Amino acid sequence: MLSGAFKTRLFHPMQKIGFAEALDSIVKSDPRYERDAYIFLRDALDFTTKQQKKVKGTSVRHVSGPELLEGLRQYALKEFGPMVMTVFDSWGIHSSGDIGNMVFNLIGAGIFGKTEKDSLEDFRNVYDFKEVFVKPFAPEKPAMTRARAELPAPKPAASRK
């Protein structure tokens, strides 16, 4: 999906567009997602490639959609903890499909690369946001519910004469 994490696109033979300029253009043409969301996505890609390098022992040249989503999930939980959904909502991100839309916006701008096998479908319904970002912080339900302790009935008050 994302070969050459920070590719640049040639608009003129002598002029390359940088990440900041690409974001300006993307956010202007597709205002669904905030600029900070794209910066976070780039950072999540870096995190993912570093994690894969630790596991595989060599540099990673390509990250698939599901691999990026798993790395993004881990990175988001690390960075934002229980506030992930609040942050993502403020950025316009509500599903794994939104991440795919952002990735393909960056591909279109020449910032991320892709292979012929990569598609938006790689990002559709990969995981449920509430399941992966809210559930880890939800209080655990006890394994067994205890029978509620019954209090003895109150004794009638003695009448005073």
Which residue ranges define each predicted feature?
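Non-transmembrane, aqueous-exposed alpha-helical and coiled segments at domain scale
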Residues: 2, 6, 11-161
